[in-house]
């Protein structure tokens, strides 16, 4: 099989889900995509286990079926991929590599790596605590692929790799040094694949060599992060040891005074695990508005005069603007700012609010795009010294490219 004709399967496993895409690397075309969900659930439940698949015909197929574990789910994916009518490969030998998205493996893996027995042992024994919600299901997905598609190279691609170029002054916390030395406590960041994709895309749009590009990438979705990029490399990012640090998000608190934890735990009579669940699942825009963490719904509520929804959106745009200003100071010179992710790509009024008041710094939003919620491209005026782009991010392409690079 030729290198450029390689088809790469991209896999992203959650605790009860498995998302997948098969990409033809010759033209970055998605041959099939879908997900298995409610893995491990009962067939008698209101929402029983199911697979969604979109393949040869382009028609979305949904089948309810027993999926007791990730292995069952992966077998269902393989069955559809090789199906006589809707399949996209005649045999699994056409798949040249499998790329797995890994949120954070701690200090043990700094870049994408081929799966070997030693790699699996290290990941299983040492990396799980650095993303305790995400890493166990990722491991289940890796093992399911190994059993179902033996002999096909598997590659772990880390959401933290793009941020490994951060200097020490950006990733260190002001904590006892032994926490860093012995436990790997430092800032790792997240959304690295998205930030990497938009950096490459911004270099193309700016017609500038990537190693000469200074930019600020704003990945804004239910989880959000902002990254400062100097000469094409990450030098700082808003998320930290976990994705809890940084911006106010859909249900995550973002930056806060750590002393609040003890104060609230004492008042509420809760333990640290309950507190962390609140910070991750019951904070952010959801907590501020008292209604929802979804920006689309918050915008509708604001139109209806909902004061807390308006306040939540104000807090969101203020925090983003504050990080943009900080990263302008970090970079010195900025060529462009990008907005990506569900919020960044489909909420122009929110994007505009993030840069309102920055005109003195040469950042001017083009108001002609304010009503266009499907626009992709430049959103700054010709007079704006710093260009702004809305870019549809594609993390799967980065995973596939990394898998292809290491499997060739």
Specify the residue positions occupied by each region the protein language model found:
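Phosphate/pyrophosphate-binding loops at sites that engage ATP/ADP/AMP, CoA/4′-phosphopantetheine
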Residues: 80-96, 204-209, 324-335
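Glycine-rich phosphate-binding/hydrolytic loop that grips phosphoryl groups
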Residues: 345, 366, 370-408
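Adenine-nucleotide phosphate-binding core of ATP-dependent small-molecule kinases
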Residues: 277, 284-288, 295-330
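Glycine-rich phosphate-binding loops at beta-strand->alpha-helix junctions
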Residues: 335-357
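Short beta-strand-loop/turn "lid" adjacent to the catalytic site in phosphate-handling enzymes
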Residues: 81, 85-134, 155, 161-170
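Short glycine-rich, Thr/Ser-proximal phosphate-binding strand/loop in the N-terminal lobe
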Residues: 17-68
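Glycine-rich beta-strand-to-loop/alpha-helix junction loops that act as flexible
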Residues: 13-14, 101-103, 220, 338-346
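Glycine-rich phosphate-binding loop of actin/hexokinase-like ATP-binding domains
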Residues: 162-266
